[in-house]
């Protein structure tokens, strides 16, 4: 029995040769047809290296690239492509394949889908295919509005005024949430759920820069 092709956003079967259902593409990218990512894995590695050396990469241990959406017309008549921009620009963050740790994008997106199933609020994310066929992990930036305007967000490394993002505790983060959150009880509950889920899924990367408070329109 032949396995059907799956949507890279929702994992349900596809009836076309595209990588996304139209509804899934509209939900994540804002277009009925998903934009193209016209880079090979070798080009991605070279871009990542150049950006890291230029000190304009998105912070983090795992290589990340900031992507902007360009609404132009492609050769096949479809509109839209994603292009690499500086760390301060773009509405998406891309994590390409890592030769040292194979299939990290697939693992991260699967974990995010599991979190959704458990009712945990997550940043919108998907897999996306490179021109050379490899899958990368892509997520929306939640510190940017659709028009590119910045949304104020601070991570716990900044909030707790720490000197080392790895030298702290979950208790210290919880106390900071209690002090600075405008919805303390709900945010503490969310934090507790994330801790339990991270323990179950083996996520041991819960350092201070992976927890943030974001200002919403009501604050």
Where are these regions (language model features)?
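Regulatory N- and C-terminal appendages and interdomain linkers associated
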Residues: 1-45, 179
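Broad hydrophobic/π-residue packing in well-ordered secondary structure
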Residues: 26-28, 53, 86-87, 92, ...
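Generic detector of bulky aromatic hydrophobic side chains
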Residues: 27, 33-35, 49, 77, ...
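Short hydrophobic/aromatic-rich motifs at helix boundaries and adjacent loops
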Residues: 35-39, 81-86, 182-183
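Short coil/turn linker and secondary-structure boundary residues
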Residues: 39, 151, 165-168, 183-186
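Conserved ATP-binding subdomain of kinase catalytic cores across diverse folds
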Residues: 43-164
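Conserved kinase catalytic-core segment
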Residues: 99-116, 169-219
